[in-house]
């Protein structure tokens, strides 16, 4: 049984993660945190999530509960996640990272930390999305050289980064399968007279509206036919359940940088 700490416990994902841990037979909720200015500091986390009294109060820093947990699950902001990574390094803890929007220096810090502690990091913890990543690799190898490739993603109005981490992950899967780096072929905006589409580019389109949980489509379009691979999430619990699954898998693993491909053993497919 893995003892889990939830960072950002009062957020949309934090609350779902608490429910996912509560419903898991492999994990137990051991700690929870919120930012220091939160009015929920000191509140019972189970009551906050509508699950009844848990005996675990929300703290403003997981360092205050460091002896109580084995793994942190962190879906917060880059600055908070990097702080929790440092805590894990200091105390030999593991961390599951669902935070997106890291700068290049931030990514480098994560890579360095993975030499000391076990880390799972993924743009999306849905099992279905990670199956889609694998399908995209195969489609790109077969169709990529003669198709136009576009990625369309849609999320709720409150999402603060664009394109989504999942859309970037889809682009990386496709570009990598074709022997390219996404940074070299990605086109994130089109406006005005852009000229004809270049051969290898991967286009991105972003929608922010209403309460859309998450929708992603990769389009492989040729003259006369088009293949679309789509994933639609209707409940954030799918991400939360995947992250809890990853925390159980990561517990007692050797230091290293892992992804959901490793958790789900997708490279064997």
From Swiss-Prot:
It catalyses: (S)-2,3,4,5-tetrahydrodipicolinate + NAD(+) + H2O = (2S,4S)-4-hydroxy-2,3,4,5-tetrahydrodipicolinate + NADH + H(+); (S)-2,3,4,5-tetrahydrodipicolinate + NADP(+) + H2O = (2S,4S)-4-hydroxy-2,3,4,5-tetrahydrodipicolinate + NADPH + H(+). Pathway: Amino-acid biosynthesis; L-lysine biosynthesis via DAP pathway; (S)-tetrahydrodipicolinate from L-aspartate: step 4/4. It is an enzyme of class 1 (oxidoreductase). GO terms for molecular function: 4-hydroxy-tetrahydrodipicolinate reductase; NAD binding; NADP binding; oxidoreductase activity, acting on CH or CH2 groups, NAD or NADP as acceptor. Keywords: Amino-acid biosynthesis, Cytoplasm, Diaminopimelate biosynthesis, Lysine biosynthesis, NAD, NADP, Oxidoreductase. Catalyzes the conversion of 4-hydroxy-tetrahydrodipicolinate (HTPA) to tetrahydrodipicolinate. Belongs to the DapB family. This is 4-hydroxy-tetrahydrodipicolinate reductase. It comes from Aliivibrio salmonicida (strain LFI1238) (Vibrio salmonicida (strain LFI1238)). The gene is dapB.
